A protein has these predicted regions:
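General N-terminal targeting signals
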Residues: 38-40, 66-71, 76, 101, ...
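Aromatic-residue detector
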Residues: 25, 55, 77-83, 99, ...
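C-terminal accessory region of radical SAM enzymes
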Residues: 80-116
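Radical SAM enzyme core and accessory elements
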Residues: 102-207
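Generic alpha-helical secondary structure signal
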Residues: 4, 8, 35, 93-96, ...
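Conserved non-cysteine loop/helix-boundary elements of the Radical SAM core domain that shape
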Residues: 1-79, 85-88
Length: 207
């Protein structure tokens, strides 16, 4: 079928409340460039995909794409898992960027505690995903195993530096994840000697 039909079908599946949709992007496909990968992540985030997985193309023995690799301009490793090394449309360095981008997705978008904040950040600010990617790379964090708490602190620090208008949402995400109120993301939360008013307007949640 047509690509537009497939996208509409995916969008519909993502809209179903009783179904969690995992969408896969494959770096190294012919005609697929790095900038298009970034664009597709934003598209899938706008559909509210439950998870966005980014993997590298593998040319398995006996497959049609492997037989046509030279014709398609694909270079791949002769050793398992036979990953694509470069194509006419994406360089070896860009494939490494895509691998690191997949780490960002797993650390933040695919982690329930930080997913909604990450989604809102990258959708409301078209350059945010690039900024977050560079921030994690420059601080040598993107390829490190990090705890849920550490990832939350990093995201809060990123918002504080680059998108301060999201600090309240970052603090709320931190609290909802059950993190400590003594850590930096809860620095603006007042807990001592606080008396609730007799009446208040509920701005968030159900009470």
């Amino acid at each position: 079928g047509k690509l537009t039909d497939a996208l509409e079908g995916l969008k519909f599946l993502c809209s179903l409340e009783n179904m969690e949709t995992h969408a896969d992007l494959i770096a190294g496909l012919p005609l697929y460039r790095l900038n298009e990968i970034f664009e597709d992540i934003l598209t899938l985030a706008s559909y509210q995909a439950g998870e966005i997985q980014l993997e590298s193309l593998k040319l398995l023995p006996g497959t049609e794409m492997r037989r046509k690799a030279d014709e398609l301009g694909i270079s791949y490793s002769p050793l398992p898992p036979y990953e694509v090394l470069q194509t006419n449309d994406i360089t070896t360095e860009e494939l490494e960027e895509a691998r690191l981008l997949s780490r960002l997705l797993d650390a933040y978008y695919n982690t329930p505690a930080w997913q909604e904040l990450t989604r809102r950040l990258i959708l409301q600010n078209k350059d945010c995903i690039h900024h977050l990617f560079l921030y994690l790379k420059e601080h040598k964090l993107i390829d490190q195993p990090l705890s849920l708490e550490r990832r939350g602190i990093i995201l809060y620090e990123f918002c504080k530096q680059m998108y301060p208008e999201f600090l309240t949402e970052a603090s709320i995400a931190w609290i909802e994840a059950g993190m400590s109120l003594k850590k930096q993301p809860a620095e603006r939360v007042r807990t001592k000697r606080q008396i609730p008013p007799e009446t208040w307007e509920v701005l968030y949640g159900t009470y």
